[in-house]
Amino acid sequence: MSDGIVIIGSGFAARQLVKNIRKQDTQIPLTLIAADSMDEYNKPDLSHVISRGQKADDLTLQSAGEFAEQYNLRLFPHTWVSDIDAENRLVKSQDNQWRYDKLVLATGATPFIPPVPGRELMLTLNSQREYGAAQSQLHDAKRVLIVGGGLIGCELAMDFCRAGKAVTVVDNSASVLAALMPPEASSRLQHRLTEMGVHLMLKAQLEGLEQTADGIRVSLDRQRAITVDAVVAAAGLRPETSLARHAGLQINRGVVVNNQLQTSDPAIYALGDCAEINGTVLPFLQPILLSAMCLSKNLLAQAGELKLPPMLVKVKTPDLPLHLAGDTRRDDLTWNIVAAKEGLVAKGVDGENQLRAFVVSEDKMKEAFALLKQLVS
């Protein structure tokens, strides 16, 4: 007997897929398997839990049981999938197996932990479960070091600072948000973080961590060191591809899919942070929403093709929020930047003066949707 459509994962991508399927078909069998509790929470809230004084349980929006009842699902929480037998269409755990008609991998991404001595001392905040394991240490910590000055690193740095902690950010880039935008566009946020008291150690290389009587001693290049109470790894995410690899699927940075979200095995699909679409991994909410809508149609034998319009990426740093869109890291762009008290507008134009990317901050974020319409992709 088949378990119908089987989904591995229970995060935002999996839940959006379930909701879209159930809008179109209330009876087709849906089976979800995940290693976590399968309770729903809003993952972006993890960037603000410390300043809000929240505990992990405070984030729960809906229990797994309520989710199963509302959407007519079979759920298998706290279940580690050990193997996918693609030839026989079987998903296996240590104690169970499920036969699928179609399989969806919504396995997400895992935090990158820099491979340095003492790496086991680093905390991660990529899930409600991870925060639950780290919350006591983080709330008690007076001195926090964040490894990584990207999107999540900047959000966490501001949040910890707003909670009254002494915050240091270490990154080997010359500016914050280096993977998202040029320094001309990120300098305003960088200045604001410094104003708030965040110690930015840029162009710095992490070399190791060691537990001492006074805390965690963090060694950096050029014989520098700092002692803190907690170290948080925010150095990026790696798509979780191990199951897909074992199943013989094509892997590049993520699980390679076509415009139908179909992998190299026509019965297996991938969605969310683990999927690589047109050579790109898009770990943001809007592409996941659009991908879930498209995939629901394909799983129900309706033709759906994913077309991604220009989309906003939001940097949730409350004291200086930012929106960006387009190919902000293109080397051939000229940046026209207007900075005023109420915010920044940075436009990246190509040699033909066509708008290819932009960054807006604070009150200028209201111009984002008009700029989106002008973007040339």
Swiss-Prot record:
Gene Ontology molecular function: any one: oxidoreductase activity, acting on iron-sulfur proteins as donors, NAD or NADP as acceptor
Q: Where is the major localization of this protein?
A: cytoplasm
Q: Which Pfam families match?
A: Pyr_redox_2, Rbx_binding
Give EC number(s), comma-separated: 1.18.1.-
What this protein catalyses is: 2 reduced [nitric oxide reductase rubredoxin domain] + NAD(+) + H(+) = 2 oxidized [nitric oxide reductase rubredoxin domain] + NADH
This protein's GO CC annotations: cytoplasm
Q: Which controlled-vocabulary keywords does the entry list?
A: Cytoplasm, FAD, Flavoprotein, NAD, Oxidoreductase
At the top level, the lineage of the source is Bacteria
- Name where it's found: Cytoplasm
Q: Which SUPFAM superfamilies match?
A: FAD/NAD(P)-binding domain
Cofactor(s) recorded for this entry are:
FAD
Q: In which pathway does it act?
A: Nitrogen metabolism; nitric oxide reduction
**HAMAP family in the record:** NorW
What PANTHER family does the database record attribute to this sequence? NITRITE REDUCTASE [NAD(P)H] (PTHR43429:SF3), PYRIDINE NUCLEOTIDE-DISULFIDE OXIDOREDUCTASE DOMAIN-CONTAINING (PTHR43429)
* Sequence similarity: Belongs to the FAD-dependent oxidoreductase family.
Looking up NCBIfam families in the UniProt record yields:
PRK04965.1 (NF003437)
The entry's function note states: One of at least two accessory proteins for anaerobic nitric oxide (NO) reductase. Reduces the rubredoxin moiety of NO reductase.
Name of the protein in question: Nitric oxide reductase FlRd-NAD(+) reductase
Q: Which organism is it from?
A: Klebsiella pneumoniae (strain 342)
What's the source species' lineage? Bacteria, Pseudomonadati, Pseudomonadota, Gammaproteobacteria, Enterobacterales
